[in-house]
Amino acid sequence: MGDLEFKLNSTDIHQNSEIVGTIGVSYPGRYDGVVINTTILDSNQHIIYKSYNQKKISQHVSRLFINKDTMPENKAEFTASIEFEPLQEYEVKFRVSIIEQHKEIESKIIFAKYSN
């Protein structure tokens, strides 16, 4: 097992449903934080991040950085949603990476399905 654990509450996502992700880092070295990159394949739409570790946010972007200083016990939880109406089924790629001095140390990928 690696230094990064990443889970989603569900890989079956629907419009405006809450997406909850949990991240755990056991990397023994120094690191700056984790970054979550999300791509809705075959679409130019973005995920909307709602919060991380109980801190409210609203960013219409495909990337969220969580600083190590805001990760008690090297853990993070984020919530997000996708708001556009899916006219087809989309594949959503979530990629979480440990970042140290602008370099990626390790990453995990989860694919989810977005549909009506």
Q: Where are the regions that the model predicts?
A:
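C-terminal beta-sandwich interaction modules and adjacent acidic
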Residues: M1-N116
